[in-house]
């Protein structure tokens, strides 16, 4: 009887020790079985596909902004609703939402797009790296500061001659490369090509 009691106590102590060792590290042998897989939101993927389709006709001159503008506003409204409801969970969700937000015209939306890209990258979605740089550049451009990654071009002249928006040239090409952004020299070469094409 005494032997059985000792064995029972040993088993209880081992179980208690397992709990003490496991809990501080947030590990549980049942976690993987209890946690259902998190799926991307199909609606966000569809909204981003529509956003891109509106911007990529065979001839860019065929984009009718009187039609695309209201569509953008509706997509933006829906993305903000999903974000406010804490529906975004996966890297793809954050990336899709950021892509739509960065087509806003408000600095706060560009900043949120950048933050969503950071979240997407942290969840393993490398597609968001370039967009993280571009959304930061859009934010800076919108508040009148030089962009950092040379992703943004503007056309200010009457004949809409594109030029690279002013760039903070202290940012290194290595950092640009880490975010899947072309070098500053490549951005300037693209600017020259766009200007030649416009003549």
Over which residues does each language-model region extend?
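Positively charged n-region of N-terminal signal peptides that target proteins for export
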Residues: 1-4
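Hydrophobic membrane-insertion alpha-helices, especially the h-region
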Residues: 9-21
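N-terminal alpha-helical interaction modules that lie
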Residues: 26-91, 123, 142-155, 161-169, ...
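Short coil/turn connectors between adjacent alpha-helices in alpha-solenoid helical repeat scaffolds
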Residues: 64-68, 105-111
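Short coil/turn linking the two alpha-helices of tandem helical-hairpin repeats
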Residues: 98, 102-106, 140
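TPR/TPR-like (Sel1-like) alpha-helical repeat modules
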Residues: 110-126, 153-157
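Boundary/linker segments of alpha-helical solenoid repeat arrays
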Residues: 123-135
């Amino acid at each position: 009887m005494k032997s059985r009691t000792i064995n029972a106590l040993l088993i209880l102590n081992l179980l208690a020790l397992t709990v003490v060792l496991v809990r501080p590290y947030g590990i549980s042998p049942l976690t993987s079985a209890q946690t259902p897989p998190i799926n991307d939101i199909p609606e966000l993927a569809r909204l981003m596909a529509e956003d891109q389709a509106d911007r990529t006709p065979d001839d860019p001159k065929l984009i009718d902004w009187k039609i695309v503008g209201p569509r953008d506003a509706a997509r933006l409204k829906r993305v903000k609703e999903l974000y406010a409801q804490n529906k975004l969970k996966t890297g793809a969700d954050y990336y899709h939402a950021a892509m739509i937000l960065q087509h806003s015209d408000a600095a706060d939306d560009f900043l949120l797009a950048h933050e969503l890209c950071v979240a997407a990258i942290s969840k393993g979605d490398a597609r968001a790296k370039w967009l993280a740089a571009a959304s930061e550049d859009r934010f800076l451009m919108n508040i009148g500061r030089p962009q950092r990654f040379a992703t943004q071009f503007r056309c200010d002249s009457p004949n809409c001659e594109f030029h690279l928006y002013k760039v903070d040239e202290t940012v290194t090409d290595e950092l640009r490369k880490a975010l899947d952004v072309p070098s500053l020299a490549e951005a300037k070469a693209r600017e020259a090509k766009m200007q030649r094409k416009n003549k």
